[in-house]
Amino acid sequence: MKSKRSRTYLVSGLTLALIFVAIILVFRDVLPDIVKDLSTVPFWGVLLLLALGFAYEAMESVLCLVIIHHKKPDCTFIDALRVTFLGVFGNITTLGAGTLPMQSFYLYRRGLDAGSGLGIMASEYVLHKISVLIYATVALLLGGDWLEQSASGLARYLLIGYVIGALIVIALTLLYTWDKVLKLVLMLLGKLPHTPKWDERREKWANSLTELNREAKKVLLVPSIRVKGIAVSLVKLFVLYSIPYAALRLVGCTALNFAQAQLLASLMLLITSALPNVAGVGPMEFAFLLLFAPWADTAIASSALVLYRVATYFFPFLLSVIVFLREEKKSLKGFNAQSA
């Protein structure tokens, strides 16, 4: 138990250290300006950002609870909150590979079979992506003229990113809800090389996709869950998209109003969904600077980015470490009790 806990601390510490080093290397040219800007941020401002960051995770938990209640009505908000933070921990420390297993194992301990757990998490992911697309579409319709007039060169690339992101969301939704799309993907998998190694991979991927499709449909095709899930997700995204605006204001940028910051933030999340990342790092930082730097100098935008990532990445990760260690301790106690 102590060795596992020590390993968890080590992995968590190394993850944060590597990300911190990466931030220093990326922003080394403007680091003195960033430090200066951050030193002017009031303590209440930091608390506000952390509160918004936690509120986003709490709303994610509400979405999770809406879906879980379809399968297990006696699950509570605390259960959903733990599932959410286990997902945060798994995404960062295992580079995404352990996210679903960690969440599904917790749900299994709460009485849900593994298939139902995977279906719940896949459904939550799809509803989130659909909501991201809806929010960005509405924001673009309302603020597209302003974006075209104030940054015509950037708007062209954003439109391309929007189209790519939208296609990915639509394809993902159809994969989980329409058997014909699943059959098409399985047929494409059949085109992979026929060697023992690739045969094993193909079978594993095909089984996983088939199970996810079967379980996700049980949730996503229920109208009440779709409506409630998307409604909660839109509120959740409103909270998330408020953080860049707050961060920019705290470091002195007043060039963007609230609605404009919401538009840019919604496009940022949609575009980054189409880009590969490692432990949730990379595309978000690039997109943040790409979208917000035109209305603030590089140092100001970089300072706001640091605040944004503290609220949406570092703080939730620290909370997720606490949740993971508590759940690991409970699991070990249960295992030892069964062994005795």
Q: Language-model segments: what does each one mean?
A:
Residues M59-F85, F89, A247-L264:
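Membrane-embedded helical hairpins/re-entrant loop segments and their flanking transmembrane helices
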